[in-house]
């Protein structure tokens, strides 16, 4: 069944600038800039009077799902340029002390499960994503921060996956060594 009109208005905050040209929506704010391509022949996106307007006529379920997805992406863009998304990963080891370094765009994990050869993982999007390694007394944390939620999530998952593939050979109840994501874009995963 077709829906005659679907129209959403998303308000733009005061300290955020938005422009839409050539199917690319650019959002810039005090903490950064994010851009994303939005194009569909049946969905119209426009920026008017401090509002982003999404509308479509005679939409099927597919267009309804797509317009709701676009609305979520735009809200994340508006939120990210004001308060960047933060992902926190913890370096855990029980058997062998593991060391983590960041050199350029490469993450180097040394002494993982006592192996001599280090694990080297190239990280994308480091021009738009900040990666910091914080070392306390006994704990090491990796903090990934970006106004773009998708790119921050990709980098955090690549860091987590860099030590995960070796767990196929080990019993995970006994070998908990690795880099584990515990804080994800404003939500503590351990409390859920």
Swiss-Prot record:
Swiss-Prot/TrEMBL keywords: Ribonucleoprotein, Ribosomal protein, RNA-binding, rRNA-binding
GO molecular function, one term: rRNA binding
Gene Ontology annotations for the cellular component aspect, listed alphabetically: cytosolic large ribosomal subunit
Superkingdom classification of source: Archaea
InterPro entries: Ribosomal_uL6-like, Ribosomal_uL6-like_a/b-dom_sf, Ribosomal_uL6_a/b-dom, Ribosomal_uL6_arc
SUPFAM superfamilies (UniProt xref): Ribosomal protein L6
One GO process term, biological-process aspect: cytoplasmic translation
Pfam family, one: Ribosomal_L6
Biological function: This protein binds to the 23S rRNA, and is important in its secondary structure. It is located near the subunit interface in the base of the L7/L12 stalk, and near the tRNA binding site of the peptidyltransferase center.
Subunit structure: Part of the 50S ribosomal subunit.
Family the entry assigns: Belongs to the universal ribosomal protein uL6 family.
Protein name per the record: Large ribosomal subunit protein uL6
Organism of provenance: Nanoarchaeum equitans (strain Kin4-M)
Organism phylogeny: Archaea, Nanobdellota, Candidatus Nanoarchaeia, Nanoarchaeales, Nanoarchaeaceae
């Amino acid at each position: 069944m077709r829906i005659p009109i679907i129209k959403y208005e998303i308000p733009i905050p005061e300290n955020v600038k938005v422009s839409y040209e050539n199917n690319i929506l650019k959002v810039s704010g005090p903490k950064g800039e994010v851009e994303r391509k939005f194009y569909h022949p049946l969905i119209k996106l426009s920026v008017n009077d401090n509002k982003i307007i999404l509308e479509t006529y005679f939409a099927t379920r597919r267009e309804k799902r797509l317009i709701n997805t676009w609305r979520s992406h735009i809200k994340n863009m508006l939120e990210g340029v004001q308060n960047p998304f933060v992902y926190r990963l913890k370096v855990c080891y029980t058997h062998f002390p593991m060391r983590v370094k960041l050199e350029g765009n490469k993450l180097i994990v040394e002494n993982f499960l006592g192996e001599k050869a280090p694990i080297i993982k190239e990280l994308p999007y480091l021009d738009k994503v900040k990666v910091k390694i914080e070392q306390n007394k006994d704990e090491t944390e990796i903090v990934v921060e970006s106004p773009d939620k998708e790119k921050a999530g990709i980098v955090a998952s690549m860091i987590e996956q860099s030590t995960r593939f070796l767990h196929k050979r080990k019993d995970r109840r006994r070998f908990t060594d690795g880099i584990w994501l515990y804080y994800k874009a404003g939500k503590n995963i351990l409390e859920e």
